[in-house]
C-alpha cells in the first residue's frame, strides 16, 4: 500500500540512527571496534548483517536489538540519498552499462514496483516523513531469524542472545496478502528498445528466459549454473572468432532460495549497434545446439570444474554459509541443499544439460531487450 520505497532502505535505513543517536554519534561510540550495521532487501526477507569479532559480539548484538526496538529517523541520510540519486540519475543514462546497473533487476522482474528502480519523480517525492511511514511498520513485523557463524568458543552465545535479540517484544506475523511470487517480463518476438544518451557507437543486447526458484529444487538451480557456464564459454569463443569482436559477453543463472519463482538465465553483452543482430543469431544458434545435441564429456568437465571450485573456495568462509542458510529455520531443506552443492555440480550429466535447454530455453518463453543510442532509429 502506498509508494514502494524498498529502494531507499539499503543506505538510509542503516544510517538513520538509533533512538536519538545519529550516524556520527554511533561512529564515535564504535570507533576502533569491529561493529557494523548493514541492511539489505532479499527476495523474501529484510536482512541486518555485520562482520565482527568475539570481543565485540555482545555490543554488536545489542546494536541490532536496539535498532529494531528503537530505530532512529534522522532526516539527513534520507536527504543525502535523495540528492545522490537525483544527481546521478542523468549520468546513468549516458551509457548502456549505466542503464543496466540501474534497471536490469526491474526489467527481469517485469517492472514489479518492489524491484524496479525509482523514476526521477519518485525520487523527488521521497521525504523523511514518507520514508518513516514506509519503513517503521515493516521493522516491527515478522519473525526474526538469527545466524551467527565463527569462532564462538569464548562466548556464551545463549546468554548474549537472551539478553539482546531474545528480549525483544514478539513481533506480529506479516499479512498473508503480500505477493510471494516474483514475476518475469512477457515473452517478446522483437526486442524491447531502451535508449541511452551517450556515444552512438555503444549499445547492449540482452536475452533471458524464466526458470524457477525455491529450496525444493536447488539441485536444478546448480545444474542451470553449469548450463550457463557452457553457454558463456561457447558465446565468448564465437563472438571473439567473428571478425575479432572484442566483446565480453556474460551468461548467468539466478535461482532464488526463498521463493519458488523469480529465477532466470540471462545472456548479455555490451557491443556496437551494428553487431546486435549477429549477437542474437549466435546466441540462438547455441540455444538450438544445446537443445538438440548433448555436450561432450570434455566440454562438461571443462565448464563444471571451475563452477565446483568456486563453490569449494566460497564454502570455507562464514559469509557464504550465512548466505546459503538464510531462511533455514523456516525451511530446513536449505540445510540439505547447502551440504550437497559440490555433489550436485559433480553429478551433472550431458543429458541434464540437454534436458534443461529443452525445458527452459524455448522461443515461447524468451524475452529480449536492446539498449541503443538515441539517434538510432527503430530496427
Predicted features along the sequence, with ranges:
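Conserved short beta-strand edge segments in small beta-sheet-based binding/regulatory domains
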Residues: 73-80, 173-175
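An aromatic/glycine/proline-enriched structural segment found at the starts
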Residues: 145-213, 372-379
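Bilobed periplasmic-binding protein/Venus flytrap-like ligand-binding cleft at the lobe interface
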Residues: 67-68, 164-165, 223-234, 282-290
Amino acid at each position: 500500500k502506498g509508494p514502494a520505497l524498498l529502494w531507499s532502505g539499503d543506505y538510509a535505513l542503516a544510517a538513520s540512527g538509533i533512538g536519538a543517536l545519529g550516524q556520527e554519534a554511533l561512529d564515535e561510540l564504535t570507533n576502533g571496534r569491529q561493529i557494523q550495521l548493514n541492511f539489505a532487501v532479499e527476495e523474501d526477507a529484510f536482512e541486518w548483517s555485520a562482520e565482527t569479532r568475539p570481543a565485540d559480539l555482545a555490543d554488536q548484538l545489542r546494536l541490532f536489538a536496539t535498532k529494531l526496538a528503537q530505530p532512529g529517523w534522522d532526516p539527513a541520510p534520507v536527504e543525502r540519498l535523495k540528492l545522490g540519486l537525483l544527481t546521478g540519475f542523468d549520468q546513468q543514462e549516458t551509457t548502456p552499462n549505466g542503464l543496466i546497473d540501474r534497471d536490469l533487476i526491474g526489467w527481469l522482474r517485469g517492472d514489479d514496483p518492489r524491484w524496479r528502480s525509482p523514476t526521477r519523480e519518485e525520487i523527488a517525492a521521497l521525504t523523511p516523513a514518507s520514508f518513516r511511514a514506509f519503513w517503521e511498520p515493516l521493522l516491527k513485523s515478522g519473525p526474526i531469524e538469527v545466524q551467527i557463524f565463527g569462532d564462538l568458543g569464548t562466548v556464551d552465545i545463549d546468554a548474549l542472545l537472551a539478553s539482546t535479540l531474545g528480549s525483544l517484544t514478539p513481533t506480529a506475523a506479516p499479512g498473508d496478502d503480500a505477493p510471494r511470487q516474483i514475476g518475469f517480463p512477457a515473452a517478446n518476438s522483437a526486442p524491447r528498445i531502451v535508449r541511452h544518451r551517450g556515444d552512438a557507437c555503444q549499445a547492449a543486447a540482452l536475452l533471458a528466459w524464466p526458470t524457477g526458484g525455491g529450496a525444493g529444487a536447488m539441485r536444478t538451480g546448480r545444474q542451470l549454473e553449469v548450463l550457463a557456464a557452457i553457454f558463456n564459454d561457447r558465446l565468448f569463443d564465437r563472438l571473439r572468432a567473428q571478425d575479432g569482436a572484442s566483446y565480453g559477453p556474460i551468461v548467468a543463472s539466478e535461482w532464488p532460495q526463498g521463493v519458488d519463482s523469480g529465477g532466470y538465465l540471462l545472456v548479455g553483452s555490451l557491443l556496437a549497434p551494428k553487431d546486435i543482430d549477429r549477437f542474437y543469431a549466435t546466441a540462438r544458434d547455441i540455444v538450438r545446439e544445446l537443445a538438440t545435441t548433448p555436450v561432450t564429456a570434455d566440454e562438461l568437465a571443462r565448464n563444471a570444474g571451475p563452477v565446483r571450485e568456486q563453490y569449494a573456495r566460497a564454502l570455507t568462509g562464514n559469509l557464504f554459509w550465512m548466505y546459503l542458510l538464510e531462511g533455514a529455520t523456516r525451511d530446513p531443506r536449505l540445510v540439505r541443499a547447502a551440504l550437497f552443492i559440490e555433489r550436485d555440480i559433480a553429478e551433472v550429466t550431458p543429458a541434464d544439460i540437454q534436458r534443461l535447454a529443452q525445458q527452459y530455453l524455448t522461443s515461447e518463453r524468451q524475452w529480449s531487450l536492446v539498449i541503443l543510442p538515441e539517434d538510432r532509429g527503430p530496427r
